[in-house]
Amino acid sequence: PNLFTVELICHGVPSCKFLKESIPSNILKKRIKQINFRSNSQYKFSLIEDNQILPSYQRPLSNDLYMKAFFNGITYRPSCLSCHFARKERNADMTIGDFWGLKSTKITDINKGVSLVLINTNAGKTLFNLCSDSLYSEERPYKEALDANEPLNHPIKKSIRYNVFRTLYPHFGYKYSLFFALPDKILAMKIKYYLKHNK
């Protein structure tokens, strides 16, 4: 009776091998203690060595090749494409994750992020009530969460880009395979970077 189960909404997990291959070898030699995908509420990909952010490896997520591949779903593990937990039927007392697709709300600073909490059982309701005094919460339509969170409906779908990357990777390696799988995305990323730094 004292056990509560909580599950995360997972959009997919790339292999650690891809992360290592995306980081320059001279940086990998450093004593990396932490990796941040958000820093001070900003969407930046940062590597941290001995509590100091490495200035040579901190960039907006929109300008990072590893994150570009992740957001386009081409570096997920094969098991992510057939995940038994990505469905409407939930297995835990409570489900938590980012609230993508949130519409009108009383929250004034939505850019700091809003969490989604799904209460699936009576035990989940008990757990939520135990925490409610420390939270600001709004009851939302269940469909609002379903519409913008693909893993709440089904596993992430395999794309043509995914097939291109997986076919080329054994022969050309990580970065070259991404260039072939994401030529338009990478070109747009480079143009944006050039324009920003050559005003």
Question: What is each model feature region?
Answer:
Residues 1, 17-20, 46-49:
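Short acidic, glycine/serine/threonine-rich loops at helix termini
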Residues 1, 22-25, 132-136:
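Short, solvent-exposed amphipathic alpha-helical segments in soluble enzyme
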Residues 1-8:
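A short alpha->loop->secondary-structure connector
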Residues 9-12, 100:
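Short, flexible loop/turn elements at secondary-structure junctions
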Residues 12-13, 26-27, 87:
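Short, well-ordered alpha-helical segments in soluble proteins
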Residues 13-22, 106:
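Short, charged, surface-exposed secondary-structure boundary motifs
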Residues 29-199:
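Long, compositionally biased charged/polar accessory segments in the mid-to-C-terminal portions
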